UniProtKB/Swiss-Prot annotation:
One of its GO terms (molecular function) is phosphatidylglycerol-prolipoprotein diacylglyceryl transferase activity. It comes from the Bacteria. It is found in: Cell inner membrane. The keyword Transmembrane helix applies. Its main location: membrane. The gene is lgt. The chain crosses the membrane at residues 27-47, 66-86, 104-124, 130-150, 181-201, 208-228, 242-262. A 1,2-diacyl-sn-glycero-3-phospho-(1'-sn-glycerol) binds at R149. One of its GO terms (biological process) is lipoprotein biosynthetic process. GO terms for cellular component: plasma membrane. The keyword Signal does not apply. This is Phosphatidylglycerol--prolipoprotein diacylglyceryl transferase.
Length: 268
């Protein structure tokens, strides 16, 4: 007996419609965007708290800079990565597809590349080492990841494969078959479990880059696990009949994460 997907309107409130220069606009606040906003505010609070306890190594102004450019990196990198990794054929046929944000579509791995680019800039601007910045950011990233997965669940998207487990759900866009609620698995692993793991690990190591390595390792492993029950992207399917794109992109994260954790102390 499958569970029914909760009928949650993805739109919290609509504004308008407004007529501007002959065009009708009806902006709306959606749960998906709201969950990311909550995650961003929570991450800002935690980073400011870390800055206050850093004995002068970080100021709140520097944290604000980090958050601003990090946010840009997530949005731009996430969208560009989604288009290039998962819908490159659409992009080749119509490059303007990149700007159709209203249709949805964000990639974690693209967002990660965007954040890394932002951190490189912050490294230069604030005259820090790259991993000093990365180790500051890594422990709060799971908050945004978890918030985003709740948004995916409310939208009824990114559901899992067909299953007969007792907690399987029938999703409105997933056909009549009961499926794994893989968004909730990702919330539990990439959000809650990874946050707790990084919090615990950050208290037990002072090695530069180790916390960043644990983030890469933990996320990569959790993503590979969940991808085994998450429905592969229809336009991509399985590579070699075995791996999803998400798993392929996670393998380098696992390997580099292991390197950062195990490399000799003091090696930059």
């Amino acid at each position: 007996m499958a569970l029914n997907f909760p009928n949650i309107d993805p739109v919290i409130v609509k504004f308008g419609p407004f007529d501007i220069f002959g065009q009708t606009f009806e902006p709306a606040l959606r749960w998906y965007g709201f969950t990311y906003l909550v995650g961003f505010v929570a991450a800002m609070w935690l980073l400011n708290r870390q800055a206050d306890r850093s004995n002068g190594l970080w100021s709140r102004e520097q944290v604000s800079d980090l958050l601003f450019y990090g946010f840009l990196g997530v949005i731009l990198g996430g969208r560009i990565g989604y288009v290039l990794f998962y819908h490159f054929d659409y992009f080749l046929a119509s490059p303007m597809y990149l700007f159709k944000i209203s249709e949805g579509g964000m990639s974690f791995h693209g967002g990660l590349i965007g954040v890394i680019t932002a951190m490189i800039y912050i490294t230069w601007k604030q005259k820090r080492t790259f991993f000093a910045v990365a180790d500051m950011v890594a422990p709060v990233v799971p908050i945004g990841l978890g918030a985003g997965r709740i948004g995916n669940f409310i939208n009824g998207e990114l559901w899992g494969r067909v299953t007969d487990v007792p907690w399987a759900m029938v999703f409105p866009s997933g056909g009549p078959e009961p499926r794994h609620p893989s968004q909730l698995y990702q919330f539990a692993l990439e959000g809650v479990a990874l946050f707790l793991l990084l919090y615990w690990f950050s208290k037990r190591t002072k090695k530069v880059g180790a916390v960043s390595g644990m983030f890469l390792l933990g996320y990569g492993i959790f993503r590979v696990i969940v991808e085994t029950v998450r429905q592969p992207d229809a336009q991509l399917g399985l590579y070699w009949g075995l791996m999803t794109m998400g798993q392929i992109l996670s393998v380098p994260m696992i390997l580099f994460g292991l390197y950062l954790i195990l490399r000799p102390e003091g090696k930059q």
